Amino acid sequence: QQDKNSLSGVYNYNPMLESLNDAQKALILGMQANLWCEYIPSRERIQYMIMPRMMALAELAWSDPSVKSWDGFKERLVKQFPRLNIMNVNYRMPDLEGFNNTNAFIGEGTVAITCLDPSVEIHYTTDGSIPTLESPQYNGPIKVTETTDFTFRSFRPNGKKGDIVKTRYVKSEYAPAADATPSKKGLQAVWHEFKGNKCADIDNAPVNGTYEISEVTIPKEVKGNIGLVVTGYFNAPEDGIYTFNLLSDDGSTLKINGELVVDNDGPHSPREVTGQKALAKGLHPIEVKYFDHNGGMLQLKVLTADGKELPVNADMFAY
């Protein structure tokens, strides 16, 4: 299943592996992409899986790395959507942007949605039902004053439906900081011998070891059947609404102050899920659970209210 990073992941891929020397790099003549179809039931689904990623691959193959520009590619891509519509290609519509899976606001919030494809109509519901062309159309920012669940869906001019997107806007107050005095910098990671596929079951599995880590990641000693429970405190530098981007392969969850903020659970390929939490300045208990059975990936990024990523340093986490 593709996500918001799938297209940029192709465009930003570097085929010149660091392990290759200059003579070996000169032997690379081109690129090839493959699509495994054992779980793809139709030609339409094939088109959905390869377009517009095929365009990103083509530009990656013929462009010198020094002139590559993701923003420039997006500008060129916008001009191709009308052609794809005329050709009736079942391309994957660009992801709706401007929100997280969970969004926090103080007092009054604003729902402001954008889409790279200008030809689509965006419709939405707030009762949990699936949007149709008869549902309210999104025509501009929406003010929210209470916790509200939105379901969005894009529609192409020919009526083709895009992916269903759900997001929650949570009316919040700044969660108070904990009265705690942790003794160590970083986080504690407990590795369980876990063979399941739900984060909630990890605690029941036998423990293989305990590790100290500086950030949310898989300790280098951990391999095979992985069930991780990472605990500690996040040090919020000031009162604010923080965005937490949790990337994992397979499942993961993030709790802050005991509340589920990011739910990226279940078996899946690399996927990033985002959530927000309003936090007062100071220490806040966090818990990340994660599982995988064949290597995997785990990463947490924290952004401030103005979208700036907080650097991982000795003051960010403690336990």
Which ranges hold each PLM region?
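Short, compositionally stereotyped local motifs that mark structural "simplifiers"
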Residues: 68, 74-190, 195-235, 241, ...
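Short beta-strand-plus-loop segments that form exposed binding edges in beta-rich domains
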Residues: 287-296
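Short, solvent-exposed loop/turn segments at the edges of secondary structure
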Residues: 26, 249, 295-297
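C-terminal effector modules
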Residues: 277-279, 291, 300-319
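Substrate-binding groove of N-acetylhexosamine-processing glycoside hydrolases
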Residues: 1-122
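Flexible loop/turn segments at secondary-structure boundaries
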Residues: 1-2, 38-42, 130-132, 198-200, ...
